[in-house]
Amino acid sequence: MADEIDAMALYRAWQQLDNGSCAQIRRVSEPDELRDIPAFYRLVQPFGWENPRHQQALLRMVFCLSAGKNVIRHQDKKSEQTTGISLGRALANSGRINERRIFQLIRADRTADMVQLRRLLTHAEPVLDWPLMARMLTWWGKRERQQLLEDFVLTTNKNA
C-alpha cells in the first residue's frame, strides 16, 4: 500500500457497505469505539489498517463518514477551481452552521472534537471535496483546525 490512504476508494466502500454493517458503525459515539466493531475492520483492512500510521486517520475518516450514508456528499473540483470545496467552505455554504459552533469545535479536546464534528456534518449535510477533507482528517492538528475556521469565516463573509 502506498503511503497515502485512497480516500475516494474508502468513500465508495462506505457508500457500498451493507445496511447492517453501516448500522453497527453508525451506533458508535466516539472514534475509538469503532475498534469494537468487526464491520469496521472489514471496511478499513484494504486501506492499510495494519500500518500504525494510518490507524488514527482511518478512525477519524470512518467516524465522520458514519454520520450517515448520504450526509457527506463528494463533489469533484471544477476545472475553474484551484482547489475543491474544503470542509470549512462546505459548512459555511450549507447556511446551517454558525461561527460559534466552529469556534467550539476547534477549541475542543481530542475525541470531543470528532464527536462535535460529526454532529456538524449531520446538521449541515455538506457537499465537499472528500479527498480534501480526508487529508485534513489524516493530520487533524492545530493547523488543520485553524484552516477550517479560516475557510468558514472567509466563505461566510463572502456570502454575506
Curated annotation (Swiss-Prot):
GO MF assignments: DNA binding; nucleic acid binding; RNA binding
InterPro entries named among the record's database cross-references: CRISPR-assoc_prot_Cse2, Cse2_sf
Gene Ontology CC: protein-containing complex
A single BP term in Gene Ontology: CRISPR-cas system
Upregulating conditions: Repressed by H-NS, activated by LeuO. Activated by the BaeSR two-component regulatory system, possibly due to envelope stress. Part of the casABCDE-ygbT-ygbF operon.
CDD domains, alphabetized: Cse2_I-E
Gene3D superfamilies in UniProt: CRISPR-associated protein Cse2
Disruption phenotype: Loss of resistance to bacteriophage lambda infection, loss of plasmid silencing. Increased levels of 57 nucleotide crRNA and also 2 and 3 spacer-repeat units.
Key words, A-Z: Antiviral defense, RNA-binding
Function, as annotated: CRISPR (clustered regularly interspaced short palindromic repeat), is an adaptive immune system that provides protection against mobile genetic elements (viruses, transposable elements and conjugative plasmids). CRISPR clusters contain sequences complementary to antecedent mobile elements and target invading nucleic acids. CRISPR clusters are transcribed and processed into CRISPR RNA (crRNA).
Record family assignment: Belongs to the CRISPR-associated CasB/Cse2 family.
Self-association state and partner proteins as the record states: Homodimer. Part of the Cascade ribonucleoprotein complex, with stoichiometry CasA(1),CasB(2), CasC(6),CasD(1),CasE(1)-crRNA(1). The CasB homodimer forms a cleft that cradles the 3' end of the crRNA. Interacts directly with crRNA, CasA, CasC and CasE. Stable subcomplexes of CasBCDE-crRNA and CasCDE-crRNA also form, both of which are able to bind target dsDNA. Binding of target ssRNA or dsDNA causes a conformational change in the Cascade complex.
Protein name: CRISPR system Cascade subunit CasB
